[in-house]
Amino acid sequence: MAAKEVVFGNDARVRMLAGVNILANAVKVTLGPKGRNVVLDKSFGSPLITKDGVSVAKEIELEDKFENMGAQMVKEVASKANDAAGDGTTTATVLAQAIVVEGLKAVAAGMNPMDLKRGIDKAVIAAVAELKALSQPCADSKAIAQVATISANSDESIGEIIATAMEKVGKEGVITVEEGQALENELDVVEGMQFDRGYLSPYFINKPETGSVELDHPFVLLVDKKISNIRELLPILEGLAKTGKPLLIVAEDVEGEALATLVVNNMRGIVKVAAVKAPGFGDRRKAMLQDVAILTGGTVIAEEIGLELEKATLEDLGTAKRVVITKDNTTIIDGNGEQTQIAARVSQIKQQVEESTSDYDKEKLQERMAKLAGGVAVIKVGAATEVEMKEKKARVEDALHATRAAVEEGVVPGGGVALVRVASKIADVEVLNEDQKHGVVIALRAMEAPLRQIATNAGEEASVVANTVKNGSGNYGYNAGNDTYGDMLEMGILDPTKVTRCALQFAASIAGLMITTEAMVAEIPQNASQDMGGMGGMGGMGGMM
């Protein structure tokens, strides 16, 4: 086991604080509408330019082990805020730094670290309750656009495109962000349920100009097995021929004689039919077939539940308004399933998302939920260069997370105003002693830090701006974008309540632990040339390093 270096008391805290300040100072320059960019060196490819706090934090590793511990703990604040709310990483870092700086001053002055931490915790609990009281629901498209615009560093085009996407696919819909090919941002919306399986034979194509299959008002047959014998399909096909309606077959596979017969019948115009493989594999395929069944009002024909394909009737089939099949995708539009059953299925999947511990499973479940609930929107980010593309894509992703958080828990006045107003209401939190009272004061001072940093980044005097805002009331605050004061809600400067809440809670949690640190332990770095010198008869090899 390698030898360790141990530092105690004030020496430990000073070195830890140095690391906190290095990381926080690099991150906080990005805060607010006039925040600056940070350039990150990459081992391959061009440097990355970003205004995303967590991206900056993740890049920072310090040479001094003890300083690095401080930096890593603040990095944890940014990462936690990013995981929970998807945004607010810079705010969380600024809050954490403010609490640590003031807290360590108090510890150096002889106050009890544990009481300081308890005071900070009490203030944060009271602040979270006040934030919830201050919060307003984010219901309309205009508010959604405003939240997205603020999170995307005042880029209105991003705000508008996210609001449009949310309007089209609903709150449960999936919105993904991709790198586009054009100079402008583009929005593609896939309505209905789409899965990544194309037609099993090009002979099903009935729209040669687009190379696709289009079926109007088709029946949908769902089978959880391979179909190779045409005899199994005959009862369904005979019943179908009488109705004159087309048929979509979704099965594990359709092959051999069965596929050949379907192709021949389709080409002769006897029965209009198309077959595709079922999406997914294993248990996920069963679940997705059931999703399609509920969406179309049909039944999955599966032998394990006692249903045989030969005995299936038209009543077991689902129906839809339209189906479009390309060589890669199948889209079912306006399935005729019962809305109550679809809603029940969506809430069931939502429950599974909450219980799942795997990020991959969560993502797949959310995709299924979106396909049932509304659809999928793809925002294609456009830019002139790859460097700009990456920076813009990160901002779009942040804005998207912030918007979801706003829909979930509502919005509060932005620009750091919400925390200033909350701080003024919780000054008289009950405490047991003077040290705890000072802990509350530390938290209240820290709550001004985001507003002060926004003002500093805008080139203004932070104390003047903070006092002007504190002397106001309600939603009155400072708009750094155009250097004016006024009602933040009327000016459209909104922050998601969840983002502000998570930033405060995570910052206080980790900063409180740092204040109570009394000793730090780290490995003593070993000299590489000394390591080589220990090899018998090869002492001279040290110079080769």
Swiss-Prot record:
GO biological process entries: protein refolding
Residue ranges crossing the lipid bilayer per the database entry: none
UniProt EC number: 5.6.1.7
GO MF annotations, alphabetized: ATP binding; ATP-dependent protein folding chaperone; isomerase activity; unfolded protein binding
PROSITE patterns: CHAPERONINS_CPN60 (PS00296)
CDD domains, per database record: GroEL (cd03344)
Top EC group: isomerase
Family annotation (HAMAP family): CH60
Name of this protein: Chaperonin GroEL
Lineage, top ranks: Bacteria, Pseudomonadati, Pseudomonadota, Gammaproteobacteria, Alteromonadales
